């Protein structure tokens, strides 16, 4: 027999420190915590092996393939500063291991099996470099940032949204009324909550009809284009598509999907439909914290964000830096750039492990949402810039005078911040002053400032380097 069976060292085959990475390789950076007594090279090689061609023993069918052509390679390992027994293992995967245009297959290969591996205490996928050759097999976002601005005819400022609350329990008619008031008051978008699908108290078709009525009424009164993110997420792909088709028939501009709970296969299907039929696609990241919140195990959100840009979506929730949900500033801005820009340089201080070239794949607009209100407006405008959606749910509907005045307050605050920025003022330093000045001209804003002046969500961010 030409080989010996038995448990073998992975590092003999899969640890290749001299390997020169190819332009077509998919590169991964894993944070590896080996079990006591397992050397980091062996742990890194094990990850490379188990996520590509390897298995735990030599098999005779190895002789029927070219391992050198198909194997993943751990080509570099470095210790994590300030952490004991934690390493960053860099793995290169040949492009042929992946099906074209399938985020599902990419994840099944790279993170499908290795995370339960005994030789590791914990494993986290920190970043992926997607080569242009692979990027080009994806359609990506249905429209992208510039086309969205052209469709909506809104330029030079962030867009404003609002999630309709209470998220569950309203009837379709009352839900539509809340949508109308917010849009009429000056918001660009309102949003179905991620868990609004089609429940007994409000079936999807009724909701879509009343929301469409609200959109057209608000558009007629304001002369602005309005939208409501109609959540098409459903229990089956067929049902999801039925909802998207109905939205298109109503002529509304945008639908929505929960891409992690719905799954990448469903998401990519919907994104293709949206491009073919002129619908924008808003993406909510429900369930992301289950995957990305642990520092030493799971997948960092920047990887989930890259995957979404490939699968397709025009907006995605990306943290706020200032509200009630997770997000450290530099790291958040790192993956915000990965969503919006065409070319992003490697920058470890922002958690970006690889230079990423998207070769003209359309960009995704980041959405800041969760515990934000008018006092946050200067910070949000400065941090996220124009190409963003700022979403105030409670920060609109919690206004003491009602939804429409709440919307007015947010729009006035936003316009004041954009004007101040364009005049060259420093939003970080003068933000509170800018809001105070604007509230002299807007009783709605003054009332909002009064309600939320003391509210803070003071916890340290977990997403640190």
Curated annotation (Swiss-Prot):
Top-rank lineage group of the source organism: Eukaryota
For Mg(2+), which residues are the binding ones? 191, 193-194
UniProt KW keywords: Calvin cycle, Carbon dioxide fixation, Chloroplast, Disulfide bond, Lyase, Magnesium, Metal-binding, Methylation, Monooxygenase, Oxidoreductase, Photorespiration, Photosynthesis, Plastid
GO CC aspect terms: chloroplast
SUPFAM superfamilies the UniProt entry points to: RuBisCo, C-terminal domain (SSF51649), RuBisCO, large subunit, small (N-terminal) domain (SSF54966)
How the cofactor is bound: the record states: Binds 1 Mg(2+) ion per subunit.
Q: Which residues carry this modification: N6,N6,N6-trimethyllysine?
A: 4
Q: What's the catalysed reaction?
A: 2 (2R)-3-phosphoglycerate + 2 H(+) = D-ribulose 1,5-bisphosphate + CO2 + H2O; D-ribulose 1,5-bisphosphate + O2 = 2-phosphoglycolate + (2R)-3-phosphoglycerate + 2 H(+)
Q: Which residues form the active site?
A: 165 (proton acceptor), 284 (proton acceptor)
Q: Where is this site: Transition state stabilizer?
A: 324
Summarize subunit and interaction data from the UniProt record for this chain. Answer: Heterohexadecamer of 8 large chains and 8 small chains; disulfide-linked. The disulfide link is formed within the large subunit homodimers.
What the protein does comes down to:
RuBisCO catalyzes two reactions: the carboxylation of D-ribulose 1,5-bisphosphate, the primary event in carbon dioxide fixation, as well as the oxidative fragmentation of the pentose substrate in the photorespiration process. Both reactions occur simultaneously and in competition at the same active site.
Mind telling me what this protein is named? Ribulose bisphosphate carboxylase large chain
Q: Which organism is it from?
A: Bauera rubioides
